[in-house]
Regions:
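Core dinuclear metal-dependent hydrolase active-site scaffold
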Residues: 1-60, 118-138
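Cap/insert and terminal regions of metallo-dependent hydrolase folds
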Residues: 36-120
Length: 138
């Protein structure tokens, strides 16, 4: 266990699923495709039902691990049916996040992509009727 290596912590962060007025979002933290696969399996087995989680209803996803190649699999995007994705990454970061592979998967699923490196702060506002609006604040 190399806790001095920053990569050690990848895949060990919180995942938050939120539902408000019928609009749901998942915040994947620094999680990878391994966690995505586990979440899909647990959802299919009904293990998330006790918490009121319905991953298949997820419309908004904050992609995992800043959009690295090891997150946001095509299978996960298909499972979620997300229409909006937020990628949190620094401008000209040394890791090349988000990767072209991840962006290609998002575009293949016709997901509306918002990126903090390009768009600045991204805000999603959900109204009382369940509708939502995504906007950027530079």
């Amino acid at each position: 266990m190399d806790t001095e290596n920053p990569d050690y912590y990848d895949g060990k962060s919180s995942v938050v699923w939120l539902d408000y007025m019928g609009t749901s979002a998942i915040f994947m933290g620094d999680e990878t495709t391994e966690t995505e696969t586990k979440l899909m399996r647990e959802d299919e087995e009904g293990l998330l039902d006790i918490f009121g989680v319905d991953l298949r209803s997820t419309e908004i996803v904050k992609v995992g691990h800043h959009g690295s190649a090891y997150s946001t699999s095509l299978e996960f995007l298909q499972y979620l049916h997300a229409s909006v994705a937020v990628v949190s990454c620094g401008e000209n970061n040394p890791y090349g996040h988000p990767t072209q592979e991840t962006l290609a998967r998002l575009f293949a699923m016709e997901v509306d992509v918002w990126r903090t490196d390009r768009d600045g702060h991204v805000v999603v506002t959900v109204s009382a009727d369940g509708s939502y609006k995504t906007r950027k604040i530079k």
